[in-house]
Amino acid sequence: MAKEKAKDDKPAPAASKRILLVDDDAEIIDAMRYALESKGFQIFIARDGNQGLAMAEREDPDLVILDMMMPRRSGFLVLEKLRRTRPVPVRVVMITANEGSRHKAYAEMLGVDDYLRKPFAMDKLIETVQRLLA
């Protein structure tokens, strides 16, 4: 039965991929949402870290785009909890206006998949998302 394929090797189309955006900046959320929806991704939005954790559990996204500095719970705490509580790790891209290399190192230690500094080009974000979800 070598001719039979148990599973299609092609990546799933963007339309089937679910992305959770967690950021307290409405302008950044709107820009990311517009860019990602235009590529066919299904978008969910949380405005703070606690809401982000609740939505991640409820919506089971394929990828989370997470701001580092937010009210109620920082992106670091959200990332740490996502890594501790999910049986299958979700892909996470952390975004930040912070220039410090210590923050990037800490995010990497917590298991972030990629790290983008604000301001970033939407093309760079889309490229990162497509690479991580391929």
Locations of regions flagged by a protein language model:
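The short loop immediately C-terminal to the conserved phospho-acceptor aspartate in CheY-like receiver
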Residues: 25, 68-69
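The feature encodes the CheY-like receiver
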Residues: 29, 71-72, 100
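Charged docking surfaces used in two-component/phosphorelay signaling
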Residues: 30-38
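Alpha4 helix (beta4-alpha4-beta5 surface) of REC/receiver domains from two-component response regulators
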Residues: 33, 77, 99-114, 127
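Acidic catalytic/metal-coordinating carboxylates
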Residues: 48-51, 74-78
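Active-site beta3 strand of CheY-like receiver
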Residues: 59-65
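C-terminal output helix
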Residues: 120-130
